[in-house]
Amino acid sequence: MIKSATLRPHVLNLKNIPMDELLKPVEIERVGDDPYWHDLCCPSCGEIFLHHRAVRVFNRDQDEEIGLETVVFEEGSHTHVSPCCDNPSLRRHGVVIDFYCEHCGEGRPEDHVVGQLCISQHKGHTGIFWRAVDNQ
């Protein structure tokens, strides 16, 4: 039996999590009457027509400055030793997925990444948030 993920509020001590103006909460929209399907909303315009591009997986031991970064994209993938400066987690593993939106951007929308969906571990908690990107 498939169970739907339940979104329940969980109180975190935000003083322990580094935040800045480049981060946004993740919003989802329920699709019709299906209790198991939800769409991500664009962090820029709020629409649901998002497409993912590159996926980056960061793997490192706790608090290590260097780790492995695996990048998967349309043309292929590669793994390399990384200083993990783009890792959304300050302490452990992290995942970053680049998204573009059909409604945002100039010219070809697929050339304009609207945000990075980040999954981060911090002191026993797994967080999910949008991170802004510079398209210049």
How should each PLM-predicted stretch be described?
Residues L40-C45, C101-C104:
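Short cysteine-rich clusters marking metal-coordination/redox-active sites
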Residues I48-H52, G107-L117:
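Short, non-ligating residues that shape and space the ligands of small metal-coordination modules
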